[in-house]
Amino acid sequence: MPIIHTFGFGGSTGAELCLVSPIYTSGAVWFVSSVGGTDAAAPAGKSREAPLASLAQAQTNAAAGDVIVILVNHTESLGTKLTLSKAGLVILGEGMGTSRPTFNRTADVNLFDVTGAGIRLENVRFATDSAAGYTADRVLISAATCIVRGCYFASGVNDSVSPALAVASGVANLTIDGATYFVSSGTSRTVTGFRGLALNGTATDLELHDVIFEGGTYGWLSHALNGAGAVTRLRAKDVDLLNGSDVVLA
């Protein structure tokens, strides 16, 4: 039985599903904000007025197919890997520009490790690393049928070793769309973002729609999009390669 949210989720900017009303969901809706939120076990976090403080807690509380709404100006720094394992989880960010939910890592771990099939990330900002030399893929997708929509991946002087977004070998039906940005901002040709999007092996049914690779002044240390294995059925439309951004596919 669908749950009817007559007035929507209550947002005014951000992911499209945060703005419409009424809206129907098949699972619970959880709210997250580092501004006044408090982490606690379920059922905490089901009220916009009393959100959880972290996405990590929301992932723990949620079940497969639930929705997590991250409120405007949320920030979260992670020193351990956050595994997103609940199949069909929908993660929606409110806000625009730098006010959208922002995540950064403080250790050499995957910031997000997406292992649940059908997970959707929308309108989330991934900041540059807090220190140089991290080798782990910043965001790693290793499950099928995921969607990355309207997200922003920043790479800078501390990001010369690992990609902003990586796709594990064998992943199928990944869609990246909705004005998703990969941006490099370095200080020299050798101190700049490593890669925006990395395909770590083979991929099947990869769709890129309205994706922007921005190399800034010094471009990318490797390639804006690098594919290490064969891609079966790549569909790309309105992909912009700007300022030294290039693509290499096996």
Task: Annotate each language-model stretch with its function.
Residues 5-8, 52-53, 61, 92-93, ...:
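Beta-strand-rich, repetitive solenoid scaffolds
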Residues 1, 26-28, 85-91, 173, ...:
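Interface-prone segments of viral and bacterial extracellular assemblies
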Residues 77, 88-139, 155-157, 184-186:
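Right-handed parallel beta-helix/beta-spiral solenoid domain characteristic of secreted/periplasmic
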